[in-house]
Structures are given as C-alpha cells and as structure tokens.
C-alpha cells in the first residue's frame, strides 16, 4: 500500500512538471553583425555563435520556473573574437592564429513572461584586460559574455541597459 502511495505521488509530480512548458528562446543576428560577418568574421562562425547563445540561455532559464511559458527573443548585436576567425585567416595569409586580443559581445532583445509582461534586454560585456585573452579560443570572451548574461537572466537580475 505504501508503495502505491509513493508511486502515485511520483506520477503526479512528473505530470505537473510535464505541464510546465520551458521558455522559448530565439536568437537572431543584428544587421550590423551580419554585415561584419559577411565581410570579415565569417557567416558560419557567427551563426554558430548565435546557436551557442541560444543553447546557453535555454540551459540557464530552464533552472528557474519563473520562465516557464516565457518567450525570450534575443538579437546578437555585436561580437568580437579573441583570435582570428577562419575567414580572417584565409583572407590574410600572414595572420597567425597565435594572435590574440580582447573580445566580447552585445545582446539585445526582450523577455516576454507567460503573463505578457515585457522586459527589455540590453547586455554587453567586453573584456578589458588583454592578459586574460591568451587563455581561450577564438570566441572565449563572447562565450563568457553569454554565460554571464544567461546566469544573470536566470537569477532575475537586471539585464537592461548594461
């Protein structure tokens, strides 16, 4: 009898969790970044970066039930690599992958709660200390920006006008 009660409670708990729809996250690439991608950075790399932003935000907001049923519409407005991209390396044969600099990204958009409340998003972070740039790959600082942004969003911290 006790086993039946435990099984019933577990089933009800899983059914409630299944009813809660996770947040819908969409990421588009801003017009200026699209032009920059076509000219210097590489379209495929910037598209991959947008996918990484979407996945990072999805993972973080899934940890906060306040975002269940919400829509998060983001625009990757700018991205700066730490190291040369494949396109930059192919366009300038004398350029070395060992070259490095500071990078980062800017994210804009809106978070639309299930209730309809709209919160504007404007977040950017660019590393200011070149000593940290040597440690990572091509998009290390941009990926750090995504992680910081997604963590702030998950915790409900203010993400507008940073």
What function would you assign to each model-found segment?
Residues 43, 58, 92-94:
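Short structured motifs
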Residues 13-53, 69, 76, 82-85, ...:
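A structural "domain/chain start" motif
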Residues 66-118, 128-134:
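Surface-exposed short loop/turn segments
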């Amino acid at each position: 009898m006790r086993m039946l009660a435990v099984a019933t409670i577990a089933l009800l708990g899983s059914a409630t969790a299944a009813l809660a729809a996770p947040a819908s996250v969409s990421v588009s690439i801003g017009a200026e970044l699209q032009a920059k991608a076509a000219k210097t950075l590489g379209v495929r790399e910037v598209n991959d970066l947008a996918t990484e932003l979407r996945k990072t935000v999805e993972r973080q907001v899934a940890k906060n039930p306040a975002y269940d049923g919400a829509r998060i519409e983001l625009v990757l407005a700018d991205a700066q690599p730490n190291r040369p991209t494949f396109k930059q390396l192919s366009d300038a044969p004398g350029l070395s992958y060992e070259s490095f600099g500071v990078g980062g990204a800017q994210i804009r958009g809106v978070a639309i709660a299930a209730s309809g409340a709209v919160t504007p998003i404007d977040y950017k972070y660019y590393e200011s200390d070149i000593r940290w740039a040597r440690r990572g790959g091509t998009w290390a600082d941009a990926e750090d920006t995504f992680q910081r942004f997604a963590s702030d969003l998950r915790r409900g911290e203010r993400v507008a006008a940073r």
